[in-house]
């Protein structure tokens, strides 16, 4: 598990270094089969808990959210922080429980993340280009980009922002 607000990945762990990892929750050595990594720290699966309701977040498939130094379950995150802001395309509010797409710091509803030319929805796995505030599918990227006169700011395969750590 990785903090969604952090671009850092956990440091590599080798078999010989397992005994050196300490749990951020209890301070004990982690000898578990799996290491959990959230908020730049390692955790026992039993110690990674919601700061509000104490629900265990270390189970496979359980999402956790981090904000303001707290680790939260989905329900408490939504209760405390409401929505994700406004969609950069339509300007409407985005509920915190809704999946979003992001490009260059802008946030979009899934339905609003569309090519500026053909209006087709861009979905996870699609390649896209973000140029001067506009989204373009691979097919409709500007001619200047194809000819090498512009640089695409974003041309990686698209992945949804699920806000999981």
From Swiss-Prot:
- InterPro entries documented for this protein: LMO_RBTN_TF, Znf_LIM
Q: Which domain of life is it from?
A: Eukaryota
The family database entries (SUPFAM superfamilies) matched by this protein are listed as:
Glucocorticoid receptor-like (DNA-binding domain)
Q: What GO terms in the biological process aspect are recorded for it?
A: motor neuron axon guidance; negative regulation of protein-containing complex assembly; negative regulation of transcription by RNA polymerase II; neural tube closure; positive regulation of kinase activity; positive regulation of transcription by RNA polymerase II; regulation of cell activation; regulation of cell fate specification
Q: In which tissues is it expressed?
A: Expressed in a wide variety of tissues.
Question: For this protein, what is any one GO molecular function term?
Answer: DNA-binding transcription factor binding
The UniProt entry's GO CC annotations, sorted and at most eight, read:
cell leading edge; nucleus; RNA polymerase II transcription regulator complex
Listed A to Z, the keywords are:
LIM domain, Metal-binding, Repeat, Transcription, Transcription regulation, Zinc
**Is Zinc included in the keywords of this UniProt record?**
yes
SMART domains reported in the protein's UniProt record: LIM
Q: Where is the LIM zinc-binding domain?
A: 23-83, 87-147
Q: What happens when the gene is disrupted?
A: Overall patterning of ventral spinal cord neurons is normal at 12.5 dpc and 14.5 dpc, but there are additional ectopic V2 interneurons (V2-INs) at all axial levels of the spinal cord; phenotype exacerbated in an MNX1 mutant background. In an MNX1 mutant background, genes typically expressed in V2-INs expressed ectopically in motor neurons (MNs). Abnormal guidance of motor axons in an MNX1 mutant background.
Transmembrane ranges, per UniProt, are: none
Q: How does it assemble?
A: Interacts strongly with LDBS. Interacts with LDB2 and LDB1. Interaction with complexes consisting of at least LDB1 and LHX3 acts to disassemble the complex; may preferentially disassemble LDB1-LHX3 complexes rather than complexes consisting of LDB1, LHX3 and ISL1. Interacts (via the LIM zinc-binding domain 1) with RBBP8. Interacts with both RPPB8 and LDB1 through the same face and cannot bind to both proteins simultaneously. Interacts with BRCA1 (via the BRCT domains); the interaction represses BRCA1 transcriptional activity. Interacts with DEAF1; LMO4 blocks export from nucleus.
Main function: Transcription cofactor. Plays a role in establishing motor neuron identity, in concert with MNX1, acting, at least in part, to disrupt LDB1-LHX3 complexes thereby negatively modulating interneuron genes in motor neurons.
Q: What is this protein called?
A: LIM domain transcription factor LMO4
Question: The organism's lineage?
Answer: Eukaryota, Metazoa, Chordata, Craniata, Vertebrata
